[in-house]
């Protein structure tokens, strides 16, 4: 079927998607879900079997990453296929790739080449460590970036050694930052009339996500340590056991500290010197946390959330993934959005985390079968049906 825009927001933009695994597809998903005409370009099955790089098509992971796209198979190592790719570049706005940096040069699809074909083209590249430099040629993996980006040194309980986070955060954030870079370049192009090369890496994204923890080192020369579920500087903030589980508390600042102490019927804490200021509470974190947990163990998580919310004290339950999607607010936000897919039939995938009131997004196209739209897309380029069979015989597509 022809491209059906998932939103009017980016329906005027055509994107050539050369990405694989996670960081690149995450970037392209942001464009596809907001209406861009995304053409996912993949090697033919004979060249690269399904699942060789990343999740196979029948997994929830693949389905969640690749909705709202069409699929074209092209063997970019073939001369005729590269000619077809160049024709696509002439008619497109954005090319996104996350190959190792030198692959673009070998294939003849680096920015200097694409810019000559279409001066308005935006090439977006995600790498492990940057396009050049001492580590420029290294392949990038999320867990490696989590370690080299410092995140694992501040994740987990004190003394237990480095710990990765439960999602591929470097991949995901590199993809999101890449999408932001693309959108910035598209806006700038309206002024200059020119494209440009957008680059980011897993390492850059991970370091940026350190945020205030990185700033503590850069400005104060403080090396943050593992703090488990405790906040590094705000006390009491963390996880506290209840009679049927645990809750998160975020008691930051003197006003909320006072509300909290009164709500749990412990006004005497307000008079104790060891808890009289934020600095004092930080220095006496362990003793204060112990006293708080003696109190929170006396009621259920639901009771504490209800009572503390009434007095404006930040708190919340700690959900498993199934509980997340059963929460009434999550349902209200429509974070699980319906779609029909080939492997799962009618199911739900994770929706976008922001809304546009005039140009909302939707799931208009199920994740494609490899090469599902090859004939259609090549016909749009002016390649006739009688040429397609010879292209297939030559492993061009």
Model-predicted regions and their roles:
Residues 45, 129-130, 202-207, 244-246, ...:
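Glycine-rich beta-alpha junction loops
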Residues 1-191, 369, 375-397:
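N-terminal helix-loop segment corresponding to the beta1-alpha1 unit
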Residues 62, 227-232, 237-238, 344-347, ...:
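Short Gly/Pro-enriched turn/cap motifs at secondary-structure boundaries
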Residues 2-6, 276, 340-390:
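Flexible, small-/acidic-enriched active-site or ligand-binding loops
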Residues 131, 159-169, 190-206, 225-232, ...:
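Conserved Rossmann-fold dehydrogenase catalytic segment
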Residues 230, 235-311, 315:
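Aromatic-enriched alpha-helical interface/lid elements that frame and gate functional surfaces
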Residues 175-195, 208-219, 261-268:
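Oxidoreductase and adenylate-handling cofactor-binding alpha/beta cores
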Residues 310-364:
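A glycine-rich dinucleotide-binding beta-alpha-beta segment and adjacent secondary-structure elements
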């Amino acid at each position: 079927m022809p491209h059906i825009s998932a939103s009017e927001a980016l329906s005027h933009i055509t994107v050539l998607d050369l990405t694989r695994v996670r960081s690149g597809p995450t970037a392209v998903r942001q464009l596809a879900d907001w209406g861009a005409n995304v053409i996912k370009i993949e090697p033919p099955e004979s060249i690269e079997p399904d699942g060789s790089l990343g999740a196979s098509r029948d997994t929830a992971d693949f389905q969640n990453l690749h909705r709202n796209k069409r699929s074209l198979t092209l063997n970019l190592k073939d001369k005729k296929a590269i000619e077809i790719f160049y024709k696509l570049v002439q008619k497109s706005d954005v090319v996104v790739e996350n190959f190792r940096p030198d692959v673009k040069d070998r294939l003849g699809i680096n920015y200097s080449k694409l810019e000559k074909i279409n001066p308005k083209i935006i090439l977006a590249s995600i790498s492990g460590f940057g396009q050049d430099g001492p580590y420029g040629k290294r392949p990038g993996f999320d867990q490696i970036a989590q370690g080299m980006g410092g995140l694992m040194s501040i994740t987990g309980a004190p003394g237990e050694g480095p710990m990765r986070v439960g999602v591929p955060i470097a991949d995901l954030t590199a993809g999101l930052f890449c999408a932001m870079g693309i959108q910035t370049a598209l806006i700038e192009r309206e002024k200059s009339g020119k494209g440009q090369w957008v680059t980011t890496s897993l390492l850059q994204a991970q370091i940026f996500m350190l945020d205030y923890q990185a700033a503590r080192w850069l400005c104060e020369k403080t090396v943050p340590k593992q703090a488990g579920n405790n906040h590094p500087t705000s006390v009491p903030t963390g996880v506290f056991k209840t009679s049927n589980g645990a809750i998160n508390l975020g008691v930051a600042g003197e006003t909320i500290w006072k509300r909290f102490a009164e709500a749990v019927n412990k006004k005497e804490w307000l008079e104790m010197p060891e808890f009289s200021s934020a600095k004092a509470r930080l220095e006496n974190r362990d003793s204060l946390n112990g006293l708080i947990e003696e109190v929170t163990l006396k009621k259920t998580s639901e009771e504490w959330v209800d009572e503390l919310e009434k007095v404006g004290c930040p708190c919340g339950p700690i959900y498993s993934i199934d509980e997340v999607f059963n929460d009434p607010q999550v349902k209200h936000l429509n974070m699980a959005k319906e779609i029909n897919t080939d492997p799962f039939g009618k199911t739900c995938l994770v929706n976008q985390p922001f809304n546009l009131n005039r140009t909302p997004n939707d799931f208009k196209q199920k994740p494609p079968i490899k090469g599902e739209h090859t004939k259609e897309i090549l016909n749009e380029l002016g390649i006739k049906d009688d040429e397609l069979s010879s292209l297939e015989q030559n492993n061009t597509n």
